Amino acid sequence: MRKNLLDLILVVALFFMISGLHLAPGQELDDLLVIKKGQSRAVTSADPNPNSNADRIKIIAPGETKVLADIKGPGIVRHIWLTFNEARPNWLEPAGSARPDEIVLRMYWDDSLEPAVETPIGDFFGAGFGYRPELKSLPVQVESGDGYNCYWPMPFYKRALITVTNESPNKNVRSFYYHIDYTEEPELAQKTPYFCAQYRNEFPEKTGQDYLILEAEGGGHYVGTVMSVRSRSPFWFGEGDAKFYVDGEAKPTIQGTGT
């Protein structure tokens, strides 16, 4: 691929996990026929004062980190919803707010000091370059460009810590609302895998070299990639073949015909 074709590549590689992602029509409703042991819980930005409607984090200043959830396990995060003020100037922030690609989501499982998930919010939900498009898929949805939903199941044995950081150099995050649904579980099966998401970017892309999407160790399922590409050429950029190397292979087990 010629160097002058690509300006920037942003990738979120998602890997983990739990089999059974292929759901038959109506399967979700059939699940209601079985009483499960877990108990539904939620952590939200709701104001504890019932007479107030300030159900949000009002401001996240540049460089500031807020804890969205700190949950004792064992449990499974089932759904994350969030929304926040758009980046362009408006009555809330006349100078504009931080973009989705400047707001970083991190998730830590159990005793780990390193995040299993570390990615800009926009890219995690499938929207690269700070844009807020509408997106519909099984695991993530962006409604009307500003309501972010994630349905990936995220199990943890001891603790789940979810944070958000404003990495804009000079813009606030305004009116950050969130709702995190999870279940308290009596126990998790041994060797239940963790959900992980890895963010990478390259500017500019290097001529003649494969772009590394994911490098990971251990057992698990690779479940998908969000790739955002900005081209400096009007021509099609997607002729690079995707290649999968498993367990130290010298040649790829899977090689596609182009991205």
Where are these regions (language model features)?
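Bacterial N-terminal signal peptides that target proteins for export
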Residues: 1-10
